[in-house]
């Protein structure tokens, strides 16, 4: 009579052991999976610390409070994978403060070859005598790209190595044919590499789609300005999952040389997305009369050239205020020097609302952005008010123009990072050493690598499952 009961107890005990082993294995699998996601990366954040004092834009980073604020090391990646002129800046150092009425953001990055003297093409277009590097872009086509001149296009002309030839230029890469617009100009280097002169947005889209875009061409005398930008997300989808921009035409639905472009270059990929962008440009907004050609000719004090009804107060450095959404990229002023203006009237002073100061020393750019926390009501549709208690999603980009980065060819954060105004003092951080061929500096650094929000959600779900598994194990073995 006891044997069946003993067998039943044995089976019950074995069932417990089996269930326990399965749950334990599941628990370990979850832990191993979570181990592959560094916990320091699950909540990327830029704290903006409360300080007493103002920005010193004449000497960025020199204000006494900066020495108490830790650097945050933000990883950057190539905007165009595999392009040799994309992703040249691997990390960006950032720290931020607020003083009750202004937010001040300090950036620093390694730049072995500063783009001194290069015009911003948009600024150069306002000044007819402009000369020197940066007046327009030149594209290096993918090695192996060839060309022919199709003579049956009798109304077309092409320019090859300075010679005007009747016929239409057709590019060929691995059997993919791309007929070029009328009056297309190319230079063929001695090694067969093709350099395309000028680059309207639609052309860049077509070249990129057909695998012919290799990068922007530079040499010792032709290059582009350096840039740094901060994107402030203002869209309806929270949190945003993408900070990328479309490559496309100049306006939505643009018809160019027989091709219609649905997307506009610079418009946001994120559905429901919108953002304000602060763009510093060494060849237009630096306020350095020696190396910034726009300030050298006093461009921003000349309303007859800029088309603006106001001038740059005190001729200080600034960041171009941009606004982008799913439709287009815009400029938050009335002239539309870089992009289409958001409106044709009002917005007095908006182009120079964000102040900047910049220095280049020992192989590093240091750029300081300063902006009032509150914006005028006329700006509020395109610029965020920044307040305590709110989380902001920001992204960063850097261009090294001397090395070929310009326009959509840049180094970017792979996702948005959170930014908040805080009232607590900075936390202690590990001291790290930044080394390069030209400078060695010891500074406090917190490393932040942006990861997709989906990874964060998976991590949280995994932790919850692990806790539930432990509870089940406890209940099973307690019985």
Swiss-Prot record:
Q: Which GO terms describe its cellular component?
A: plasma membrane
Give the highest taxon in the source lineage.
Archaea
Q: How does it sit in the membrane?
A: Multi-pass membrane protein
- What's the name of the protein? Cytochrome b558/566 subunit A
**What is the residue range of the signal peptide feature?**
none
Q: Which residues are glycosylated?
A: 73, 99, 152, 172, 182, 191, 219, 262, 288, 302, 325, 348, 385
- Listed CDD domains: DOMON_b558_566
What the entry lists under NCBIfam families is as follows: sulfolob_CbsA
What are the disulfide bonds? none
